[in-house]
Amino acid sequence: VSNQNPEQIARDAIDAQLRDAGWVVQNKDSINFHDGQGQAVREYPTDTGPADYMLFVDAKPVGVAEAKRETLGHNITTVEEQTAEYATARPKWIQSNGKPLPFLYETTGVLTRFTDLRDPKPRSREVFSFHRPQTLREWLAGCRSLRDRLRDLPPLDPQGLRQCQVEAITQLEASLRSAKPRALIQMATGSGKTFTAITSI
């Protein structure tokens, strides 16, 4: 293992993470869509070049994973554009519906970022691991993305809440609807922060 270059070391780690998440890692020369719930095919050819990993569920491409060496780490977001190109590329040997693949990953084998193109305002976020093939299948079966569902939160019932709590929860919900990545609730001591936090969940 010590004679491997950084790219090979990263690929070994990525292969292991994909397997841990339930993907069957395969080479492009020996694809078997009947092996396992989902297949991660290395160097799958597209009309813009080979994708590091093309993810298949039910013999259909559903996503891509762009692999980079670990030293890229904190700068991994710089390859998001490359991943997006593969998502819109036409895969070889299979019929394509012309739509971009919805699930995009960039990974070093240590750090993994994920973008769900079904989101109203797609943007990448760090995830602990690859999603399981079954999870992607469920999402594709009609389940809206979390960020999309957050746009349709039910109205708040203000009964039993103080005005400052109503304002805090209303502003938090507005932030969630806008797909903002962070929100801060600042309330005075004794104003019911704990109750507000529980109510907002």
Model-assigned labels for residue ranges:
Residues V1-I201:
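ATP-dependent helicase/translocase motor core
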